[in-house]
């Protein structure tokens, strides 16, 4: 929703302040395939294994999302 940095549904999330829906100090992310322990996963880390002849999708190091690289190998 507008103004939210993270999903504040669970007070147990160590990366997200459930009262404000903002990331806790020092956190880069709260969830996502490229988020681990509140930090973006290193660029080039496989976040989605390829199917068929397509290449694996990898983290960018700048986002918690796992982009679809869409490259045919």
Swiss-Prot record:
Major subcellular location class: secreted
InterPro entries associated with the record: Disintegrin_CS (IPR018358), Disintegrin_dom (IPR001762), Disintegrin_dom_sf (IPR036436)
Matches recorded under Pfam families: Disintegrin
Entry keyword set: Cell adhesion impairing toxin, Disulfide bond, Hemostasis impairing toxin, Platelet aggregation inhibiting toxin, Secreted, Toxin
Subcellular location: Secreted
SMART domains assigned to the protein according to its UniProt record, in alphabetical order: DISIN (SM00050)
Expressed in which tissues: Expressed by the venom gland.
One GO CC term, this protein: plasma membrane
PROSITE patterns xrefs: DISINTEGRIN_1, DISINTEGRIN_2
Positions of disulphide bridges: 6-21, 8-16, 15-38, 29-35, 34-59, 47-66
Sequence motif Cell attachment site, residues: 51-53
Gene3D superfamilies: Disintegrin domain
MF terms (GO), sorted A to Z: toxin activity
Domain Disintegrin: residue ranges: 1-73
Note: The disintegrin belongs to the medium disintegrin subfamily.
Quaternary organization: Monomer (disintegrin).
Protein purpose: Inhibits fibrinogen interaction with platelets. Acts by binding to alpha-IIb/beta-3 (ITGA2B/ITGB3) on the platelet surface and inhibits aggregation induced by ADP, thrombin, platelet-activating factor and collagen.
Family indicated by similarity: Belongs to the venom metalloproteinase (M12B) family. P-II subfamily. P-IIa sub-subfamily.
Protein name, per record: Disintegrin lutosin
Organism in which the protein naturally occurs: Crotalus lutosus (Great basin rattlesnake)
């Amino acid at each position: 929703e507008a103004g939210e940095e993270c999903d504040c549904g669970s007070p147990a999330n160590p990366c997200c302040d459930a009262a404000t829906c903002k990331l806790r100090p020092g956190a880069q992310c709260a969830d996502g395939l490229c988020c681990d322990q509140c930090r973006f996963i290193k660029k080039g880390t496989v976040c989605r294994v390829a199917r068929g002849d397509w290449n694996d999708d990898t983290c960018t190091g700048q986002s918690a999302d796992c982009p679809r690289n869409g490259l045919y190998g």
